[in-house]
Amino acid sequence: MAEEKYIMAIDQGTTSSRAIIFDKKGNKIGSSQKEFTQYFPNAGWVEHNANEIWNSVQSVIAGSLIESGVKPTDIAGIGITNQRETTVVWDKATGLPIYNAIVWQSRQTTPIADQLKEDGYSEMIHEKTGLIIDAYFSATKVRWILDHVEGAQERAENGELMFGTIDTWLVWKLTGDTHVTDYSNASRTMLFNIHDLDWDQEILDLLNIPRVMLPKVVSNSEVYGLTKNYHFYGSEVPIAGMAGDQQAALFGQMAFEPGMVKNTYGTGSFIVMNTGEEPQLSKNNLLTTIGYGINGKVYYALEGSIFVAGSAIQWLRDGLKMLQTAAESEAVAKASTGHNEVYVVPAFTGLGAPYWDSQARGAVFGLTRGTTREDFVKATLQAVAYQVRDIIDTMKEDTGIDIPVLKVDGGAANNDFLMQFQADILNTAVQRAHNLETTALGAAFLAGLAVGFWKDLEEIKAFQEEGQQFEPIMAEEEREDLYEGWQQAVAATQQFKRKNK
């Protein structure tokens, strides 16, 4: 009898790395997770040590094999999904990064982005890349590293340095020599022309980024290379699927049809709509991005990015010591007897879509002497839902497509209070994924399809099980009154800006 085969997904996130092993039916049979250090060298800066990320990935590969009892030889393929935009530049000869990885949340490159806007490049960059000019994307991060590491520009021009987002870094480490990225990750660099499906020479010239340091761009489902046997316990396993975390979640939620929308509540919150085979440029500051490329076709998406979602709950736990665990936030919020008069605007690193205000900072409104810890926790959860409404309303306006149901996943989707309030404030049904591992599952599906582990999308669709659905129950007047209060709070937050001295 043939040994059963499995697919491994490596999910390299903002605060931790995970490896999950799935069987033929898409069931999780083993996993491992490891956190790594966040570095905050200055206000608004966020960095990671790329070698610590690589170490954490090696650790979870081992951990998932140990927990599941699966042999390395039984892994048919590996799928990678990753925190997007985070930028690594490393030495081609030694494999050592020349600077910390600059994380997607980091605002240290804002002056470069501001200069591009001032010089009038916003429209050109939006039309070519689908993105708005912002420090969020990789382009300004690469420029910053080349500016701040002595001799880096010259070495990059000489072909001695390599650039990659985290997917690229991990494939390069695992295979020892393959320098690739996929359509979804490339589309988040602000260097990639989403119409021509190639790096854009005009933007590279504008930022003086040498093309020689960029990876080759490939589809989301094909064999990129084999693991070096010494990195995978003697086995050479095909790395066969790759997608940025939000696009992987779109695929894992099986949002294969145009108009389907998913929201992942992670560190940030990311609402993504499949718009089919034609890119749709937003008039309202949403991002046009590539969902995935598979079987010779490319599917585009519209995305709204919220920088702070789950991390606001972590802040309540770690910064303010209001919670022992993140999960406790649900019970604490439900115990609030206030009337929703408190608003928390968690603009810790500025505001994402649709405001794109990097100077805004967090604020709390509506406090009285009677405000309690419970009210504060509830308002923080509600802030996540309000931000999602900002984006869903914008999406409807941009596309003219009604959104009858919002598919949700990610850690905070476990929070019943948040999900019910989300349904209420949107006046839309919210459907929780039965399997909240949609990001890892998406990467596994992409890899499994490439190696013939699964035949086609139809076979995958058969695994879909619906989770709990939350229906809106709030009165229209209350909903609009609460949302108006949120809009006032955001406007007030944007008024209060202090330049970092």
UniProtKB/Swiss-Prot annotation:
Q: Which domain of life is it from?
A: Bacteria
The protein's matches in Pfam families, at most eight in alphabetical order, are given as: FGGY_C, FGGY_N
Q: Which residues carry this modification: Phosphohistidine?
A: 231
- Return the EC number: 2.7.1.30
State where glycerol binds. Answer: 84-85, 136, 245-246
Alphabetical UniProt keywords: ATP-binding, Glycerol metabolism, Kinase, Nucleotide-binding, Phosphoprotein, Transferase
Sequence positions that bind sn-glycerol 3-phosphate: 14, 84-85, 136, 245
Named in its record, the pathway it takes part in is: Polyol metabolism; glycerol degradation via glycerol kinase pathway; sn-glycerol 3-phosphate from glycerol: step 1/1
Cite the CDD domains for this sequence. Answer: FGGY_EcGK_like
What PTMs does it carry? The phosphoenolpyruvate-dependent sugar phosphotransferase system (PTS), including enzyme I, and histidine-containing protein (HPr) are required for the phosphorylation of His-231, which leads to the activation of the enzyme.
Q: How is its activity regulated?
A: Activated by phosphorylation and inhibited by fructose 1,6-bisphosphate (FBP).
Which residues are ADP-binding?
Answer: 14, 18, 267, 310, 411, 415
Q: Name one GO molecular function term.
A: ATP binding
GO cellular component terms attached to this protein's record: cytosol
Q: Biological process (GO) annotations?
A: glycerol catabolic process; glycerol metabolic process; glycerol-3-phosphate metabolic process
- Sequence positions that bind ATP: 14-16, 267, 310, 314, 411
- Give the catalysed reaction(s), semicolon-separated: glycerol + ATP = sn-glycerol 3-phosphate + ADP + H(+)
| UniProt cross-references to PROSITE patterns, sorted A to Z | FGGY_KINASES_1 (PS00933), FGGY_KINASES_2 (PS00445)
Q: What does this protein do?
A: Key enzyme in the regulation of glycerol uptake and metabolism. Catalyzes the phosphorylation of glycerol to yield sn-glycerol 3-phosphate.
The similarity comment for this entry is:
Belongs to the FGGY kinase family.
Q: How does it assemble?
A: Homotetramer and homodimer (in equilibrium).
Q: Which HAMAP family match?
A: Glycerol_kin
Name of this protein: Glycerol kinase
Q: Which organism is it from?
A: Enterococcus faecalis (strain ATCC 700802 / V583)
* Highest classification ranks of the organism: Bacteria, Bacillati, Bacillota, Bacilli, Lactobacillales
